[in-house]
């Protein structure tokens, strides 16, 4: 059998060999014969052609010779002279040949345009070009690729050579105390001492006095903590130029309290030189300059709140650990709250009952107490079940009743000198409560409160008359809110007389913990017991309250409002020490230890925080400003890794992993940072292990975020790196020319930004009127920067409108800006002006973006954008903005303000270009990604219509393959009807098969030449560039030259769309003319992601069908982007989109394949295929396997996109349609529309559509949460002490800081506000009490507030809510929520006149000041008497005001000049 098999095999092989050889011989013979015949015929034709030319030329020569001979014979016969012997002269020869040559040149030039050899040559070249498909070199305009300047990626190394090093270090160290003038700085330098330390010497030890500031001039100092068991732990290492000090100890020393080192020790690591500055040196300066003392205390409190509390609370999760529940070494200044035993309390009670006058009773009631009781419901449980337990009150330090009769007898002898001054106050208190009997004498309560607060403020008994008229006493029921977190109106100094107050703070993890059932939005920080004070931190910083304060049980509190404290401060500046000392006493030892370790760093633009390859021993928190992280590659090239904004943590991963710095981080603009050393982290971790959990959670979120964006990075970046974010906090707006309507543009942008969150618009006029005309001087730099920093903290974004010249305000805007918007008119010249170049030199590191404005009346599309960008290489991004007609209307400043006072009342159009720009600046852009799928891409049109009907704005568009075509149509037209029409026309062209047959070519690279396909795309878009599209757009292609995907955001549109559709095998790759790379369909690597049509064509270069498209910029060959990424949602996310809708129309591979075992026979597959009686099998063929291999990376990328949290993945049901079914355009479009409409309706019902179409808050703004310029204005306490003149004089308010200062303004000065303002005060400013404006006031931005107030809605008013005794989450009644009628102006729409109506609003003051006579007269003529009844509390307040006014009149008559011009 083996022999037979061998014979059969040999015979088969022999026959096969014979047959193949015979066939090859026959073919070769036929080809050889054909070649011979064709060669012979070709040679014969050549010979005939040559012979014809030769014969023609020979005949021409013979004819010429015959004519010459004939003429010569005739001439000789006529003259009788034989010319054969004559010769011409040389001059005649030269003339003859010269004329002949000129005649020939003329004939040659004529042949170039008529006929002859030139015409034939051109015809042959045209024929050859058409046959060989040669193309002329016709490259379009390209974007110039310019490297950023060295300053953009490099730090500033230049130093201050003019200042000695020791003076420079000292100047930087004491900068934490604020800005000092040169004379004051020189006085401090006189007290400095130089300390020489050897290695191992102690700088200070435990029990040494903590009364100095130490500045390291050279060497290194180690600061460590000594534990109770004798072990030590390094806290931080102080290097050259750094300092060691505690600002909290600084307050102790100034307050006269001795401070000693208890747990902190400093030792020299090496030989060091240290500068010692005693804290007592500041005493001399402060005595001569009280304003400097107040400013230093304010800076210390601001640092405590912004640095210490921010770092420990927000990043380490420490809240209650920062304060101590019982103040240490607290000598209670409240004689009502002294700790007494139960027997003592009972004995005092019995003695008081026997010796109390008979007219008194035992039931404590007051109007406030009755009001609080009425607000509670009967069903509420008792919040304090132990309220009647005397032992309970003894243990908690809050006695329910303590007799004041004996206290009155004791205080009569002490208070006799000031009895007369307090008589009227006591009589007012008694008169206010005469209607209801009470046990506790109100006069004694008032006197006790005044005495207690006087001691807390550090005032003597002789100063009691200063504060007694400002002290108010209230009785509270449980769960009454005194002030809420973030409230700047009701800031007071609260002193607890009886009962307890609970201090809460919002939970930093409330957002992530909201999914948990036990999550609490607030955390209990500490309790305030009788004899303790609270509210000093917000009072000294001038900012809003950082805590929410509620009464824990029935309590009695005494308080002084913020305006009153500032008036007292003008007379007694040293009360800031008492307030600061009260804040310091409340802090825990942990905060004091952290105060030694934490540093507050100020960095100018260009200065480096740390450099690459340095040791990482600390991390940094960005308090304000912007940082840029730059990595230096081994070849020396620098690249941006990320940028950090306000609140970001920098360098945390490197510090924890103990690795060297991987990047260099430098300040883009002037910035403030908090430095947290590694030793502090270790010390806190040992004491509070919960910090480790917080850090793990923080690092996990950062690691997951980097994993989602790592796939699209060209190079590996550390986990620490933060991708370049497009969320800015400050934006500067600069006009290119004077005719740019910058003010209307700023208003429109402000209008759109207001829908996202609190925003502020600042101009030079606004800042000048708020802070003074000299605020831009160098001496006022601290005040200006502090004020601007506070405005940035209170708003999500701040708009800095620059002047049209390089003024000091413009320079300040450049220093404060995170990004600069250069605004120009798109239809004007693109030339760069001198002012614009100065702006670039002034802020070289700041990112700049170009904004081109177009009027909507011209219907013109953007054009020539490349010229704008090439002229400005410093621009990193551009925006096309279509503007309404009102922006380009020429009006005066007042008319513009009046116009936008009405515009700002309306809801912004979320689909406008201004809203798109607003979302980009705030990091809320919505991106649309369209995947590839051939004819199934018609579903994109239906989905676009469904998206438009769902109200979802589209800010960015990216596409691959057919998605690149549809996305480019939408970005170009932005009209669903026009987009549908053009897409349908293009699909019809794709169904004309006779044109495709003419495009067939020899299939070496592809089946089609791609010429007709290019023509269809070019006819659709024309010569449009990607830069000229209305909406930012990108397409993705597969670069087969560099074996990667390429993202095209600029260049020829049709070319890169064509390259993204170059499917392998159908079209040749597109060759990038810039670098010669071959580009294929981008879907091979990423199926969801210049002239416009070129990149569209490149994105549609299907390999094998159409040839790859050659990029005209670099020569790379481009293919369809579907080979790399068919749904490039990750690319869209990296480009700045926060929310993405990804639509996938690609085909799905069959994964249900047959398991055929270890081997596979093709004959078996053939048998299964052709035998109808067997079960079919699913085995991929060779083309299918190649296709699956090509799409491997695309499938992996698609799965990552589906699992991401930033993308909404949508796939319409279009699987039944084939890739080339372009004839079913309308049917596929309808399928996509119906599916999209149902999909978005389902999302809307489920509440998941809000992040796409409800990015703004539709609720009317409320007083409690709306930010206004005056509400968050920076309060410079030093200015109060100096009694500087007012910047903006207010008639009718004699004092700069009146008690009702917070009610003077309730809106931005720069733009209209939706809050109510006391219109009566404003009318005093006008001539004749009118609200109209004179022509001299047309350029005032402040008038915008006044116009806005006329159109305020009653919805802005809030009403008090009933408290919940148990739940903290339920809104609780506020102490200031007292409904009182006030007069509000309203405009009659029919007549346009101002009317006065009576509304009920929540007053923010306890005692509303009485109106001035002029105001009363105005109110009498325009108001109607209130119909509501006054409450007993209102009567009490009015009577109290009358008593105070009588006292003031008597004091004036007696010559007593106390502070009589204030209002209580």
From Swiss-Prot:
* Keyword terms of this UniProt record: Developmental protein, Endoplasmic reticulum, Hydrolase, Lipid degradation, Lipid metabolism, Membrane, Neurogenesis, Phosphoprotein, Transmembrane, Transmembrane helix
Transmembrane stretches, by residue range?
A: 35-55
Q: Where is this motif: DGA/G?
A: 1081-1083
Membrane topology (Cytoplasmic): 56-1464
Q: What is its EC number?
A: 3.1.1.5
Return the Polar residues bias intervals: 409-420, 1450-1464
Q: Which residues form the active site?
A: 961 (nucleophile), 1081 (proton acceptor)
Motif mapping: GXSXG: 959-963
Give me the reactions it catalyses.
a 1-acyl-sn-glycero-3-phosphocholine + H2O = sn-glycerol 3-phosphocholine + a fatty acid + H(+)
Membrane side Lumenal: which residues?
1-34
**Where is a nucleoside 3',5'-cyclic phosphate 1 annotated to bind?**
176-303
Residues binding a nucleoside 3',5'-cyclic phosphate 3: 575-702
The PNPLA domain extends over 928-1094
Q: Which CDD domains match?
A: CAP_ED (cd00038), Pat_PNPLA6_PNPLA7 (cd07225)
The GO cellular component terms are: endoplasmic reticulum membrane
Q: Where is this motif: GXGXXG?
A: 932-937
GO biological process, alphabetically ordered: glial cell apoptotic process; lipid catabolic process; membrane lipid metabolic process; membrane organization; nervous system development; neuron apoptotic process; phosphatidylcholine metabolic process
Q: Where is this region: Disordered?
A: 329-393, 409-438, 1352-1374, 1400-1464
- Give start-end positions of Basic and acidic residues composition bias: 1429-1444
Positions of modified residues (Phosphoserine)? 421, 1175
Function, as annotated, reads:
Phospholipase B that deacylates intracellular phosphatidylcholine (PtdCho), generating glycerophosphocholine (GroPtdCho). This deacylation occurs at both sn-2 and sn-1 positions of PtdCho. Its specific chemical modification by certain organophosphorus (OP) compounds leads to distal axonopathy. Plays a role in the signaling mechanism between neurons and glia that regulates glia wrapping during development of the adult brain. Essential for membrane lipid homeostasis and cell survival in both neurons and glia of the adult brain.
Q: How does it assemble?
A: Interacts with Pka-C3; interaction inhibits the catalytic function of Pka-C3 and the esterase activity of sws.
Write out the similarity annotation.
Answer: Belongs to the NTE family.
Q: What is this protein called?
A: Neuropathy target esterase sws
Q: Which organism is it from?
A: Drosophila grimshawi
Give the gene name: sws
